[in-house]
Design a protein with these regions (language model features):
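NAD(P)-dependent dehydrogenase/reductase Rossmann-like domain
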Residues: 1-162
Length: 162
């Protein structure tokens, strides 16, 4: 998932694996389909959805855009762009909730404390591994906590921004 937002005159952007709630419109985007979910200050929430991944769908979309440009040649839409350079904020400053897998069952209590865990996930038969859902924390705080453990994987999720 690629996501971005503007806060305090900085723009934050990241492309990474995310968990998406089943009630979110992007949840059903899969296979060769792409989706764009936008929240605008005037328009509110809108979503664009369609073929776009793979050789033929991508080519079809490009041809359709070119045909549309030719059909509307000479018609311009005035847009108000600013040449002011925006400052890119560090993704390490952004707060998120994470699901993290750790390959050291003996470190469970230490990991719960380090990640301020709100939920522990264990699976019967996987005696050497566990998962945690963290409290809301910055990417930087997550990286510092993760450096202490044998992390098998992480996935971000944040219902407030996606």
């Amino acid at each position: 998932l690629a996501t971005s937002f503007k806060k305090d005159e900085k723009v934050y952007a990241i492309t990474a694996p995310f968990l998406i709630d089943a009630t979110h419109p992007l949840y059903n985007v899969n296979d060769v389909l792409n989706g764009i979910y936008i929240h605008g200050n005037v328009i509110g929430d809108v979503m664009f959805f369609g073929a776009g991944a793979g050789k033929l769908p991508t080519a079809s979309a490009v041809v359709a855009d070119v045909v549309d440009c030719v059909k509307h040649k000479g018609r311009n839409v005035m847009t108000l762009w600013s040449y002011e350079k925006l400052e890119l904020g560090s993704a390490m400053e952004v707060e998120r909730t994470f699901f993290v897998r750790i390959k050291d069952r003996a470190a469970l209590e230490k990991a719960k404390e380090a990640f301020h865990a709100v939920q522990t996930v264990t699976v019967d038969g996987l005696d050497d591994e566990f998962g945690l859902v963290t409290a809301n924390m910055t990417e930087q705080a997550f990286a510092q906590a993760a450096a202490q453990f044998d992390v098998a994987g992480r996935i971000r999720f944040d219902k407030t921004t996606i």
